[in-house]
């Protein structure tokens, strides 16, 4: 009560934030009349002035009003788009490192240009992050025109670019790209052997579009770079064959003499918990599996892998559905994104689950991969100096954004009032009744011409609904993961009169639905693509036709049919000698294509305008949801496709008690309400109690998913600190910063490690583990300890350690004299990197194994999280010790042969490698002598034995 009164008097936090920004909007508006008078050159010159002021120490914050005003003026001149006042506020929110919640159709893409331009002035780099390659390319081409006009450079990162192209794109003032590409580039950079090969710069400022999708929906999916293992795939087929023989059971509560008066009993061979997405064998099931696989004890430590793969096979059969969670295409299992409905080729479930599903579907089983590098989006984006984001739906997840990313959400008011009524949910008892009602409403609205966007939560449901519409002869488009190539094209026209579009979840997100149709989209359909794409096609066809050596007339005629109106351009570029400047031709063809395309856009504008008015009169775009998603935010995103920029529209959800959400999380409560109200089969109910019960079910799931993500980040934070240590160490090595000192430090720490392991404090030296000491010193440093009885009586742990250190330093000085400073520094650098990378890879595998079994610690009354932190730390310290020892050992033993001895290396390589292994194995017990130089030899053009990846003549053979 008191809180509500305070809120009424001083306003909510959001209102106070907006109130603070309106005076700045006024200042920006006051600058507009002066900027309108400037020529294009003078407006562009403002950027150079801003850069000069920034270099003199002026802050970006103080330049914000002027920079935003300049960017707005450029938008008017280049794109014919003027930023609204509320968009200026959105830009300020982003610049301040917060999340701007802006409703669909309010121009988020245009808003991003404001903070991008302002922060681009610093030259430190701005990353504009989108969810897919299409949007990254579209936005860099479209909005990038504003930045280029103002003199800033623009790059785009999409799949398939070479390293030099990526480096160039990251060097730009503003770089557009996808979250996946940014994350993988970071991991790839930290696996490289040369700082000059890095593509990314230090992380400065990021604007994340669809921030909820990337930072929340994707948060449970770590980015992983992996390499294949050699394990056999037969085990997956063997286990998969027994799963259909197991009977699914239930968990039943029976009366018992316990505190609660009840106990759980299990039927069948396994039970399934759909909330936790887990499947568990019962006692009967364990016995049956042991019998079928002919093993004595499934829980024997030697059979833990069999148990693990059996549980994953159970999950594959009981919890993962084809055309819902994945599709099978060309004998390959491809994951479907549960939030967008898009296919995710290249992504794989970990922990053997993907292989279990491949076995279930009879698809080719790919080997399990070993992790080489990994990071979660949560930890990747927390590395930016300043992070901001925008979306249509963030307020429901405001708590999570603040707790995990320290990001506040500011809700931006709409430019025009929202006119879309969201009708109450309609609930039926069965899915069949629900679909009959959905078809009835679609038919009714379609007959009067109102466009309808139907939202489904899976490919399976969208195709089922499509079949029902076909039976009613209702024309429609289906947009799901199987048609994602046409996604933007179909969604852009979903607002046309009489259009029925079925879309899986948020497919087509990022594309505006204009009532009456999109003139630009219609022009693309008629033109068979964009001017740039058609020009690229034409140039390829032209070069192919040229290769056929046809006479000039025939050449022009063959192309005229496919590219009408282009031949006069070709003719004008042909010189008298029959030569042609291809670069000039491409520019001329692009100009002609742009002209033709613009004519088509202008032709479609009046058609769309008339249709727009008709659709508005019919009530705008109607959103028809066929099932509630686990998250209210996803439902709000679907609703948000209608009612953009003050357009009319409406939305309604049709549900049934058989829907997953209600069946798993809320059916008892809803079913009880329906029974009390006496709902018969075929009848629907619309009631506030039901709506609240559904919202409560969604809140439960959201809280559950938040806990999972929080749990993940708490575990990954441990790895994140370790990753930072390793990657920082790698960078310092690559930069060559005091590399000799680093090695000397490793060498002295290794001496300390040996002393700690074998020397016992406060005991006579004769009782120390001298066998362990001499073996270790011989193995690592390559010298033999010659200890006299007299020395043994006088030695102490302190002077013994100092003696070892002195001897090791002298031995290293000998190696330095032998190799020379430059070669030794190069060897230290390469060997350090090789050892760190190999040990880090093994460490990641150990961490994976630790994660798999850590949950069982709970049964021993131990906190799994604390146990994980403790054991992960121990594993990390053990790895650091191994790194030190291996680096020191390799430096003390490595040999590079003379140039004359290298020529036989290629022929002898397999045998030589065998010898190297033997030499390494024998080194521990051999007397202090170096391996023969002839044992490591390479030809001038062979890969250098040091492992740098370069040819020997350009590396150690210089």
UniProtKB/Swiss-Prot annotation:
Report the co-factor binding details.
Answer: May bind 1 zinc ion per subunit.
Record keyword Endoplasmic reticulum present: no
Q: How does it sit in the membrane?
A: Peripheral membrane protein
**Source organism, top-level taxon:** Bacteria
What keywords appear on the UniProt entry? ATP-binding, Cell inner membrane, Cell membrane, Cytoplasm, Membrane, Metal-binding, Nucleotide-binding, Protein transport, Translocase, Translocation, Transport, Zinc
UniProt: Zn(2+) binding residues: 944, 946, 955-956
| InterPro entries in the record | Helicase_ATP-bd, P-loop_NTPase, SEC_C_motif, SecA, SecA_CS, SecA_DEAD, SecA_motor_DEAD, SecA_preprotein_X-link_dom
Where does this protein hold ATP? 87, 105-109, 512
What is this enzyme's class at the first EC digit?
translocase
Which stretches does the entry tag as region Disordered? 923-958
User: What stretch or stretches form a coiled coil here?
Assistant: none
Q: Which GO terms describe its molecular function?
A: ATP binding; metal ion binding; protein-exporting ATPase activity
The cofactors it requires, by name, are:
Zn(2+)
UniProt subcellular location: Cell inner membrane; Cytoplasm
Catalytic activity annotation: ATP + H2O + cellular proteinSide 1 = ADP + phosphate + cellular proteinSide 2
Gene Ontology biological-process annotations: intracellular protein transmembrane transport; protein import; protein targeting; protein transport by the Sec complex
Look up the EC number in the record and give it. Answer: 7.4.2.8
Q: Name one GO cellular component term.
A: plasma membrane
User: Its family?
Assistant: Belongs to the SecA family.
State the protein's purpose: Part of the Sec protein translocase complex. Interacts with the SecYEG preprotein conducting channel. Has a central role in coupling the hydrolysis of ATP to the transfer of proteins into and across the cell membrane, serving as an ATP-driven molecular motor driving the stepwise translocation of polypeptide chains across the membrane.
The subunit structure is:
Monomer and homodimer. Part of the essential Sec protein translocation apparatus which comprises SecA, SecYEG and auxiliary proteins SecDF-YajC and YidC.
What's this protein's name?
Protein translocase subunit SecA
């Amino acid at each position: 009560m008191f809180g509500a009164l305070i809120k009424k008097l001083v306003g909510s936090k959001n209102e106070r934030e907006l109130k603070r920004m309106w005076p700045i909007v006024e200042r920006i508006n006051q600058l507009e009349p002066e900027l309108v008078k400037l020529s294009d050159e003078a407006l562009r010159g403002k950027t150079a002035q801003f850069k000069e002021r920034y270099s003199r120490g002026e802050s970006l914050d103080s330049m914000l009003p002027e920079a935003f005003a300049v960017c707005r003026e450029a938008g008017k001149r280049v794109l014919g788009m003027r930023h609204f006042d509320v968009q200026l506020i959105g830009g300020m929110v982003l610049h301040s490192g917060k999340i701007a919640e802006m409703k669909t159709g309010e121009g988020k893409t245009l808003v991003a240009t404001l903070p991008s331009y302002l922060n681009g002035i610093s030259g430190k780099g701005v990353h504009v992050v989108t969810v897919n390659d299409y949007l990254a390319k579209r936005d860099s081409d479209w909005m990038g025109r504003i930045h280029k006009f103002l003199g800033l450079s623009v790059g785009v990162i999409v799949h398939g670019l070479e390293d030099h192209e990526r480096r160039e794109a990251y060097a730009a003032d503003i770089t557009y790209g996808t979250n996946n590409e940014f994350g993988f580039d970071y991991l790839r950079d930290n696996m490289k052997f040369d700082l000059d090969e890095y593509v990314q710069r230090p992380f400065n400022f990021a604007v994340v579009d669809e921030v909820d999708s990337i930072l929340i929906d994707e948060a449970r999916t770590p980015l992983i770079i992996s390499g294949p293992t050699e394990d056999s795939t037969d085990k997956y087929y063997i286990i998969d064959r027994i799963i259909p023989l197991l009977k699914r059971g239930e968990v039943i509560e029976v009366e018992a003499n316990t505190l609660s008066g009840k106990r759980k009993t299990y039927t069948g061979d396994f039970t399934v918990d759909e909330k936790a997405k887990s499947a568990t064998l019962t006692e009967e099931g364990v016995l049956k599996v042991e019998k079928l696989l002919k093993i004595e004890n499934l829980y024997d430590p030697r059979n833990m892998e069999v148990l693990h793969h059996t549980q994953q096979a159970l999950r594959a059969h009981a919890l993962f559905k084809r055309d819902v969670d994945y599709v099978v295409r060309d004998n390959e299992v491809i994951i479907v994104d549960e939030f967008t409905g898009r296919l995710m080729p290249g992504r794989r479930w970990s922990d053997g689950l993907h292989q279990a599903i491949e076995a279930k579907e009879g698809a080719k089983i790919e080997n399990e991969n070993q992790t080489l590098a990994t990071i979660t989006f949560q930890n990747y984006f927390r590395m930016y100096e300043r992070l901001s984001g925008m979306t249509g739906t963030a307020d429901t997840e405001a708590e999570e954004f603040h707790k995990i990313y320290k990001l506040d959400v500011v809700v931006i008011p709409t430019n025009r009032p929202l006119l879309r009524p969201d009708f109450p949910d309609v609930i039926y008892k069965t899915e069949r009744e629900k679909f009959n009602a959905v078809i009835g409403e679609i038919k009714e609205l379609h007959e009067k011409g109102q466009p309808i966007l139907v939202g489904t939560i899976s490919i399976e449901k969208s195709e089922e609904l499509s079949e029902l519409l076909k039976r009613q002869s209702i024309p429609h488009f289906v947009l799901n993961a199987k048609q994602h190539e046409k996604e933007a094209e179909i969604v852009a026209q979903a607002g046309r009169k009489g259009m029925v579009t079925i879309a899986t979840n948020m497919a087509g997100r990022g594309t505006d639905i204009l009532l009456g149709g999109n003139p630009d989209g219609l022009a693309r359909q008629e033109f068979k693509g964009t001017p740039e794409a058609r020009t690229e096609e034409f140039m390829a066809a032209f070069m192919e036709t040229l290769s056929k050596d046809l006479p000039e007339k025939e050449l022009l005629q063959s192309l005229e049919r496919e590219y009408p109106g282009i031949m006069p351009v070709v003719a004008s570029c042909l010189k008298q000698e029959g030569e042609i400047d291809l670069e000039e031709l491409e520019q001329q063809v692009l100009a002609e294509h742009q002209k033709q395309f613009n004519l088509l856009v202008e032709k479609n504008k009046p058609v769309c305008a008339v249709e727009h008015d008709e659709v508005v009169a019919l009530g705008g775009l109607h959103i028809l949801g066929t099932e509630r998603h686990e998250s209210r935010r996803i439902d709000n995103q679907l609703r948000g496709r209608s009612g953009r920029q003050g357009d009319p529209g409406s939305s309604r959800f049709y549900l049934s008690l058989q829907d997953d959400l209600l069946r798993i999380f809320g059916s008892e409560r809803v079913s009880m309400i329906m029974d009390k109200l006496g709902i018969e089969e075929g009848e629907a109910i619309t009631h506030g109690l039901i709506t609240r019960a559904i919202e409560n079910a969604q809140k439960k799931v959201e809280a559950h998913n938040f806990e999972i993500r929080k749990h993940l980040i708490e575990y990954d934070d441990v790895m994140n600190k370790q990753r930072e240590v390793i990657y920082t160490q790698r960078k310092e090595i690559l930069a060559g910063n005091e590399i000799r000192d680093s090695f000397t430090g490793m060498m002295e720490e290794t001496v300390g490690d040996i002393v700690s392991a074998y020397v016992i404090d406060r005991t006579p030296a004769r009782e120390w583990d001298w066998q362990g000491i001499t073996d270790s010193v011989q193995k690592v440093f390559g010298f033999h300890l010659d200890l006299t009885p007299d020395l043994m009586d006088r030695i102490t742990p302190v002077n013994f350690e100092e003696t070892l250190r002195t001897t090791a330093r002298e031995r290293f000085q000998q190696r330095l004299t032998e190799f020379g400073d430059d070669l030794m520094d190069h060897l230290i650098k390469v060997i350090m990197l090789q050892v760190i990378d190999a040990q880090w890879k093994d460490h990641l595998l150990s961490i994976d194994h630790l994660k798999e079994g850590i949950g069982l610690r709970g049964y021993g009354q131990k906190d799994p999280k604390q146990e994980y932190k403790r054991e992960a730390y121990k594993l990390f310290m053990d790895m650091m010790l191994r790194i030190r020892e291996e680096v020191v050992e390799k430096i003390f033993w490595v040999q590079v042969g003379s140039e004359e001895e290298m020529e036989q290396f290629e022929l002898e390589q397999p045998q030589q490698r065998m010898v190297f292994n033997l030499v390494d194995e024998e080194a521990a017990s051999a007397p202090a002598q170096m391996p023969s130089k002839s044992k490591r030899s390479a030809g001038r053009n062979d890969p250098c034995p040091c492992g740098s990846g370069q040819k020997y003549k350009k590396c150690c053979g210089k």
